[in-house]
């Protein structure tokens, strides 16, 4: 019998970032209870030796999002990756498909974490106090309409905003972002053109 290969999309991340994100998820599952429906499975409860753990996030009665932690993979592009990564699956019954981090954040935001109420834009236009506030900004992928951006500015300018959780909410996009390859911008002093040869 021939070998059968299975290809999966895995986002390579460093070990410390994965530990920080996992502890943040555990904090919101067990302490703040805002993610109490989420299930954390340890590495010894999984059926694959490369899997370091799983987080099951129910979205509806039949569908769920699963964040799979992998270890012992081939080293990534950078030396600090050290063979750690995550995979994202959307499951409904026996069907499963892989999704990207932005879509995962949107799916999480449709079910969990408070957002603006439907009548909040009308309240802002009328000058009334807005009582709701979005605590999970990474769940909104697009830039948004001009009306929505103006509405957010009105909400930010209010002197009292509803308090969210003290620790940030677990965002899959933040977990998988590539901080190391971003250009660093210096703030403050401009560089001396005579010294840099420009």
From Swiss-Prot:
<comment type="similarity">
    <text>Belongs to the primate lentivirus group Vif protein family.</text>
</comment>
<feature type="modified residue" description="Phosphothreonine; by host MAP4K1">
    <location>
        <position position="97"/>
    </location>
</feature>
<feature type="short sequence motif" description="HCCH motif">
    <location>
        <begin position="109"/>
        <end position="140"/>
    </location>
</feature>
<keyword id="KW-1035">Host cytoplasm</keyword>
<dbReference type="GO" id="GO:0044423">
    <property type="term" value="C:virion component"/>
</dbReference>
<keyword id="KW-0945">Host-virus interaction</keyword>
<feature type="region of interest" description="Membrane association">
    <location>
        <begin position="177"/>
        <end position="178"/>
    </location>
</feature>
<comment type="subunit">
    <text>Homomultimer; in vitro and presumably in vivo. Interacts with viral Pr55Gag precursor, host APOBEC3G, UBCE7IP1 isoform 3/ZIN, ABCE1 and possibly with SAT. Forms an E3 ligase complex by interacting with host CUL5 and elongin BC complex (ELOB and ELOC).</text>
</comment>
<dbReference type="GO" id="GO:0030430">
    <property type="term" value="C:host cell cytoplasm"/>
</dbReference>
<keyword id="KW-0832">Ubl conjugation</keyword>
<keyword id="KW-0694">RNA-binding</keyword>
<dbReference type="GO" id="GO:0020002">
    <property type="term" value="C:host cell plasma membrane"/>
</dbReference>
<feature type="region of interest" description="Disordered">
    <location>
        <begin position="159"/>
        <end position="198"/>
    </location>
</feature>
<dbReference type="Pfam" id="PF00559">
    <property type="entry name" value="Vif"/>
</dbReference>
<keyword id="KW-0597">Phosphoprotein</keyword>
<feature type="modified residue" description="Phosphothreonine; by host">
    <location>
        <position position="145"/>
    </location>
</feature>
<protein>
    <recommendedName>
        <fullName>Virion infectivity factor</fullName>
    </recommendedName>
</protein>
<keyword id="KW-0472">Membrane</keyword>
<keyword id="KW-0946">Virion</keyword>
<feature type="region of interest" description="Multimerization">
    <location>
        <begin position="152"/>
        <end position="170"/>
    </location>
</feature>
<dbReference type="GO" id="GO:0003723">
    <property type="term" value="F:RNA binding"/>
</dbReference>
<dbReference type="InterPro" id="IPR000475">
    <property type="entry name" value="Vif"/>
</dbReference>
<dbReference type="GO" id="GO:0016020">
    <property type="term" value="C:membrane"/>
</dbReference>
<feature type="region of interest" description="RNA-binding">
    <location>
        <begin position="76"/>
        <end position="115"/>
    </location>
</feature>
<keyword id="KW-1032">Host cell membrane</keyword>
<feature type="modified residue" description="Phosphoserine; by host MAP4K1">
    <location>
        <position position="171"/>
    </location>
</feature>
<dbReference type="GO" id="GO:0019058">
    <property type="term" value="P:viral life cycle"/>
</dbReference>
<feature type="short sequence motif" description="BC-box-like motif">
    <location>
        <begin position="145"/>
        <end position="154"/>
    </location>
</feature>
<feature type="compositionally biased region" description="Basic and acidic residues">
    <location>
        <begin position="188"/>
        <end position="198"/>
    </location>
</feature>
<keyword id="KW-1043">Host membrane</keyword>
<keyword id="KW-0833">Ubl conjugation pathway</keyword>
<comment type="function">
    <text>Counteracts the innate antiviral activity of APOBEC3G. Forms a complex with host APOBEC3G thus preventing the entry of this lethally hypermutating enzyme into progeny virions. Functions as an adapter molecule, recruiting APOBEC3G to the ubiquitin-proteasome machinery. Targets APOBEC3G for degradation through the assembly with elongin BC complex, CUL5 and RBX1. Binds viral RNA and affects the stability of viral nucleoprotein core. May play a role in viral morphology. Interacts with host ABCE1, which seems to be involved in lentiviruses capsid formation and displays RNase L inhibitor activity.</text>
</comment>
């Amino acid at each position: 019998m021939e070998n059968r290969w299975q290809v999966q999309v895995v986002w390579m991340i460093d070990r410390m970032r994965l530990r920080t994100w996992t502890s943040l998820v555990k904090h919101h599952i067990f302490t703040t209870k805002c993610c109490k429906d989420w299930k954390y499975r340890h590495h010894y409860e999984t059926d694959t030796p490369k899997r370091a753990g799983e987080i099951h996030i129910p979205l509806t009665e039949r569908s769920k999002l699963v964040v799979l932690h992998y270890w012992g993979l081939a080293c990534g592009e950078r030396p600090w990756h050290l063979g750690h990564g995550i995979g994202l699956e959307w499951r409904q019954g026996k069907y499963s498909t892989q999704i990207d981090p932005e879509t995962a954040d949107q799916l999480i935001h449709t079910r969990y974490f408070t957002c603006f109420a439907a009548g909040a834009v009308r309240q802002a236009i009328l000058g009334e106090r807005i009582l709701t506030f979005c605590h999970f900004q990474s769940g909104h992928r697009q830039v948004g309409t001009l009306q929505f951006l103006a509405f957010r500015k009105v909400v930010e300018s209010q002197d009292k905003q509803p308090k969210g959780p003290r620790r940030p909410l677990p965002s899959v996009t933040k977990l998988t972002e590539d901080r190391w390859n971003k250009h660093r911008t210096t703030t403050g002093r401009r560089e001396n053109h005579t010294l840099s040869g420009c």
